[in-house]
């Protein structure tokens, strides 16, 4: 059975996912400070708007809506035009509706500790926009003071988002040097886990990404070098990073594996296009 996938169009990311994220999957993007988690999520939303005209929603739990828009623009991603067209929305779960700027937001969560309220506001936003992509930044904020509730909170949000046909990234914070994913039981509740890391070796920092799991999908089983450029994240999907006690090295993947990844991305795009053509004919 063919798995329908959502292309991220993040350079190198679809390749290491063998075609993209399976539709309706909830993917945990985990990592320490400065690893590029939020950038990855915003790039996922922006690419959906530009490449596929897919409406998206950003749930802001740690940034003021003004800061969110500014951070998009930092990479040349102007989402204000899509916001005006009703194709992009920010769910403000940061300001609690306080302040003149916050009062202009259409989707506001006044009590962030009330996951039921957040789910309701998010449900309304998804339905109104007919959204296809959602990013929550960061989901770990919701259970910092109640870690025992982490899994149930994630499951509640997952039911709403996947139930309405969306594919999502949940940004999850971990401490620098910590190798977990952020929140007990969360890794079992989500469909996919992607870990971003920033490692130091002999005074030099190395960025990398590794896919720990992805339901209904083959994945690359190695750690890939990654860069944050002026245009966003770029993953060196055809190379792997290896850091030991004695050296750090970047080596090319076997050619067979490179060809398999390229083919998977091409087939994913062809499958999506054929389905869209069939839907147009039915209309």
Swiss-Prot record:
Region feature Disordered, mapped onto this chain: 261-283
Superkingdom assignment: Archaea
Annotated ranges, domain KaiC: 4-249
GO terms, molecular function: ATP binding
Disulfide bonds: none
PROSITE patterns: KAIC
Keywords from the named record: ATP-binding, Nucleotide-binding
Ranges of Acidic residues composition bias in the record: 267-283
PANTHER family for the chain: UPF0273 PROTEIN TM_0370
Similarity-based family: Belongs to the UPF0273 family.
HAMAP family (UniProt xref): UPF0273
Record-linked NCBIfam families: thermo_KaiC_1 (TIGR03877)
Protein name: UPF0273 protein STK_18300
Taxonomic placement: Archaea, Thermoproteota, Thermoprotei, Sulfolobales, Sulfolobaceae
